Amino acid sequence: MPLYEHVFLARQDLSQAQVDALAAAATEIVESNEGKVTKTETWGLRSLAYKIQKNRKAHFVLLNIEASGATIAELERQTQINEDVIRYMTVRVDEHEAGPSVMMRKNDRERSRRREREGE
């Protein structure tokens, strides 16, 4: 089956539990259409480069998916209908990245630097 990366941005006023529920709903859509979600990453609340639907920040979520094109079409259709999702993008990839994504590594690096500054 083809491999995809699906990233969506959720509104800034949602709680983390609501964002996790959105990710779980996307996983359910994929699995009910005979696909498989291999990894889910929540990158947290991040600033946007420009306002999107009056939002300056958004919760970022990444899903690594193994599924057919029809499954991805259904996932995108359901994502587009959801008012809590302000942007999404699905990209077909040759292989999924092993371990944490670049964004997660960047977040870990920033946290460790912050701890070092506070400890000094």
Curated annotation (Swiss-Prot):
List where Basic and acidic residues composition bias occurs: 105-120
Name a GO molecular-function annotation.
small ribosomal subunit rRNA binding
InterPro entries linked to this entry: Ribosomal_bS6, Ribosomal_bS6_sf, Ribosomal_S6_plastid/chlpt, Transl_elong_EF1B/ribsomal_bS6
Keyword set, alphabetical order: Ribonucleoprotein, Ribosomal protein, RNA-binding, rRNA-binding
Biological process (GO) annotations held by this record are: translation
Does the record's keyword annotation contain rRNA-binding? yes
GO cellular component terms, A-Z: cytosolic small ribosomal subunit
What Pfam families does this protein map onto?
Answer: Ribosomal_S6 (PF01250)
Q: Where is this region: Disordered?
A: 97-120
| Record function comment | Binds together with bS18 to 16S ribosomal RNA.
Note the HAMAP family from the entry: Ribosomal_bS6
Family the UniProt entry places it in: Belongs to the bacterial ribosomal protein bS6 family.
| PANTHER family in alphabetical order | MITOCHONDRIAL 28S RIBOSOMAL PROTEIN S6 (PTHR21011), SMALL RIBOSOMAL SUBUNIT PROTEIN BS6M (PTHR21011:SF1)
The name under which this protein is listed is: Small ribosomal subunit protein bS6
Gene behind the chain: rpsF
